[in-house]
């Protein structure tokens, strides 16, 4: 039997190959990173260069699900569009029914459940996306979750998905500390530093989404805004290098 063609059949060694292939599609996608700060959550994505005549506003890897929740994804954009639309409808339905916005975990669990159903149904295939979902609960607590094509989800302090995820996670493990997220600017810099590990051409290929407590989502697409942070990061690197040289001399 061809186990890699059947969506709902396990191989003898316990694999669901279609789910694993969906995870491979995620690994080929643009890098996306997320960091949970003290009073801020930040998403950053690697921007791919667009065709000369293409409107780059139509190429977005970050989107709002509700006033208090935002999502970035890696993988197949068409699949992401279905998940995003379903999640937005669920957010609206929750507001109408409960008269409160969704919690970040609630909508993450909804998205994860949707993905999981597509791993157990005939005539469907798994969604080829992973998502980073950030936001604030109504008590002001910042949240960051990650979901994958199998339907699992976990809470994180900082994480990455997409083709550069492994390198970025190593960077986060080295640099993520309470001091590194002490202020909003430091949290934003941490995201940009991590993306610079895998993104060429500096700030012009980076897009950021910033959400602060009790403030609306702000998406930074202007290269000038991001280059300002990149210049500060480069300056800090140079100063650290000079300090190291003084110590060794």
From Swiss-Prot:
Cited PROSITE patterns: PROTEASOME_ALPHA_1, PROTEASOME_ALPHA_2
GO biological process, one term: proteasome-mediated ubiquitin-dependent protein catabolic process
Keyword Cytoplasm: yes
Cell compartments where the protein resides: Cytoplasm; Nucleus
A Pfam family the protein falls into: Proteasome
Keywords: Cytoplasm, Nucleus, Proteasome
InterPro entries xref list: Ntn_hydrolases_N (IPR029055), Proteasome_alpha (IPR050115), Proteasome_alpha-type (IPR023332), Proteasome_asu_N (IPR000426), Proteasome_sua/b (IPR001353)
Coiled-coil regions, chain positions: none
Keyword Nucleus assigned: yes
Superkingdom to which the source organism belongs: Eukaryota
GO CC, alphabetical: cytoplasm; nucleus; proteasome core complex; proteasome core complex, alpha-subunit complex
Role this protein plays: Component of the 20S core proteasome complex involved in the proteolytic degradation of most intracellular proteins. This complex plays numerous essential roles within the cell by associating with different regulatory particles. Associated with two 19S regulatory particles, forms the 26S proteasome and thus participates in the ATP-dependent degradation of ubiquitinated proteins.
Family affiliation: Belongs to the peptidase T1A family.
Subunit structure: The 26S proteasome consists of a 20S proteasome core and two 19S regulatory subunits. The 20S proteasome core is a barrel-shaped complex made of 28 subunits that are arranged in four stacked rings. The two outer rings are each formed by seven alpha subunits, and the two inner rings are formed by seven beta subunits. The proteolytic activity is exerted by three beta-subunits PSMB5, PSMB6 and PSMB7. PSMA7 interacts directly with the PSMG1-PSMG2 heterodimer which promotes 20S proteasome assembly. Interacts with HIF1A. Interacts with RAB7A. Interacts with PRKN. Interacts with ABL1 and ABL2.
Protein name per its UniProtKB record: Proteasome subunit alpha type-7
Species for this entry: Gallus gallus (Chicken)
């Amino acid at each position: 039997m061809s186990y890699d063609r059947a969506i709902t059949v396990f191989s003898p060694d316990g694999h669901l190959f279609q789910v694993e292939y969906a995870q491979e599609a995620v690994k080929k996608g643009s890098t996306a990173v997320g960091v949970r700060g003290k009073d801020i959550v930040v998403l950053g994505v690697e921007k791919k260069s667009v065709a000369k005549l293409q409107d780059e506003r139509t190429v977005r890897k970050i989107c709002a699900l509700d006033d208090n929740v935002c999502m970035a994804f890696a993988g197949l954009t068409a699949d992401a569009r279905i998940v995003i639309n379903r999640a937005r409808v669920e957010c609206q339905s929750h507001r109408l029914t409960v008269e409160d916005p969704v919690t970040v975990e609630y909508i993450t669990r909804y998205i994860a459940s949707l993905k999981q159903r597509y791993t157990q149904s005939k005539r469907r295939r798994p969604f080829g996306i992973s998502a980073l979902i950030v936001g604030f609960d109504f008590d002001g607590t910042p949240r960051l979750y990650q979901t994958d094509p199998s339907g699992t989800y976990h809470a994180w302090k900082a994480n990455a998905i997409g083709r550069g995820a492994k390198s970025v996670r190593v960077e986060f493990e080295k640099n993520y500390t309470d001091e590194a997220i002490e202020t909003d600017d430091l949290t934003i810099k941490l995201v940009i530093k991590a993306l610079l590990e895998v993104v060429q051409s500096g700030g012009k290929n980076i897009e950021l989404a910033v959400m602060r407590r009790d403030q609306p989502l702000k998406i930074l697409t202007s290269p000038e805004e991001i280059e300002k942070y990149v210049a500060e990061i480069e300056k800090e690197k140079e100063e650290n290098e000079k300090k190291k040289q003084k110590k060794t001399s």
